């Protein structure tokens, strides 16, 4: 999936759209997506000016966005008005290395379970085959009205 396809499944836009491309998608099972980290991103103005590092919460958000694409593809649907797909839980988060401008973040997500509308995912972010972040994320779709 290219960026235009990604935008059909995520409501996020600049500067908060954190998926650049989907490399692999096994519907109902897993997704591999990319985030190209560039110095031009606004978080690097203050995190940190002399040594820019991607904030850990942004890495987790990129993983959460990958879960959204995977969940919508599994349900053969797209986001609709009056509905929002949201992060409802984060477990076992580990930050092992820093992410800097110029890195390409590989986001790997697999479905663990789906129960009563709550999706649980096992997630990993890597740079150059080295694990950067791992986490278990829980998400659901809710009405906004």
Curated annotation (Swiss-Prot):
Keyword Lipid metabolism in record: yes
EC number(s) recorded for this UniProt protein: 4.2.1.59
Listed GO CC annotations: cytoplasm; membrane
Subcellular compartments: Cytoplasm
Top-rank lineage group of the source organism: Bacteria
Entry's family note: Belongs to the thioester dehydratase family. FabZ subfamily.
Protein name (record): 3-hydroxyacyl-[acyl-carrier-protein] dehydratase FabZ
Native organism: Vesicomyosocius okutanii subsp. Calyptogena okutanii (strain HA)
């Amino acid at each position: 999936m290219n960026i235009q396809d990604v935008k059909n499944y995520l409501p996020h836009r600049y500067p908060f759209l954190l998926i650049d491309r989907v490399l692999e998608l096994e519907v109902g099972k897993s997704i591999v997506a990319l985030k190209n980290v560039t110095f031009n991103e606004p978080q690097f103005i203050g995190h940190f000016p002399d040594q820019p590092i991607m904030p850990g919460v942004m890495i987790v958000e990129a993983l959460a966005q990958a879960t959204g694409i995977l969940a919508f593809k599994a349900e053969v649907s797209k986001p609709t008005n009056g509905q929002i797909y949201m992060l409802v839980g984060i477990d076992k988060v580990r930050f092992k290395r820093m992410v800097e401008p110029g890195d390409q973040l590989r986001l790997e997500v697999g479905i663990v379970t789906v129960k009563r509308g709550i999706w649980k995912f096992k997630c990993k972010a890597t740079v150059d085959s080295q694990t950067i972040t791992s986490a278990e994320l829980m998400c659901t779709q809710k009405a906004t009205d």
